[in-house]
């Protein structure tokens, strides 16, 4: 059972990295601070951390731990979001003028990559695929629309 669970987690991490890579390609083509590898690694890490939640919960359900610890899988998701928020904040730069801020879209795409990884980590593949497509549409199509407007 443990090997099957490990393989399942590994496959989810691979899928999350693939979906994160979809976002990363768009960022990479635009020469942004966080590109293909960063998005893939963040999505994969999110899926791994959430996927390991099952193993952690199972481990601590053993008789010797039951009275000592309670496992809350939501805390793993909170940890992913906090870590990614820290990394994403590093992509945001403020210019010399008060209205000059860059990197917000890249930071947002990193957070979405983590969310996609979380979705894959809990085997919500349809949601992960759908959100990946929506993100690419927002990143690619809306950029063209923004350029036409301004």
Model regions: which residues?
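Hydrophobic, membrane-facing alpha-helical anchors
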Residues: 75-92
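C-terminal ends of transmembrane helices
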Residues: 21-33, 87-99, 141-147
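Transmembrane helix interruption/hinge and helix-loop junction motifs
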Residues: 119-129
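Internal alpha-helical transmembrane segments of multi-pass membrane proteins
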Residues: 71-79, 100-103
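Alpha-helical transmembrane segments of multi-pass small-molecule/ion transporters
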Residues: 129-137
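Residue-level signal for the membrane-embedded core of alpha-helical transmembrane segments
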Residues: 14-17, 84, 108, 132-133
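Small-residue-rich segments of transmembrane alpha-helices in multi-pass membrane proteins
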Residues: 41-51, 105-119
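Alpha-helical transmembrane segments and their membrane-interface boundaries
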Residues: 1-76, 128-130, 144
């Amino acid at each position: 059972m443990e090997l099957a669970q490990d393989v399942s987690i590994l496959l989810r991490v691979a899928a999350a990295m693939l979906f994160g890579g979809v976002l990363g390609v768009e960022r990479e083509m635009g020469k942004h601070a966080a590109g293909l590898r960063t998005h893939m690694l963040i999505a994969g890490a999110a899926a791994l951390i959430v996927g390991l939640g099952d193993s952690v919960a199972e481990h601590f359900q053993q008789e010797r731990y039951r009275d000592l610890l309670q496992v809350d899988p939501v805390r793993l998701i909170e940890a992913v979001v906090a870590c990614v928020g820290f990394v994403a904040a590093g992509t945001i730069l403020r210019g010399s003028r008060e209205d000059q801020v860059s990197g917000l879209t890249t930071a947002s795409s990193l957070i979405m990559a983590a969310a996609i990884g979380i979705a894959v980590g809990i085997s919500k593949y349809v949601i992960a695929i759908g959100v990946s497509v929506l993100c690419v549409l927002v990143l690619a199509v809306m950029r063209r629309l923004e350029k036409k407007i301004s």
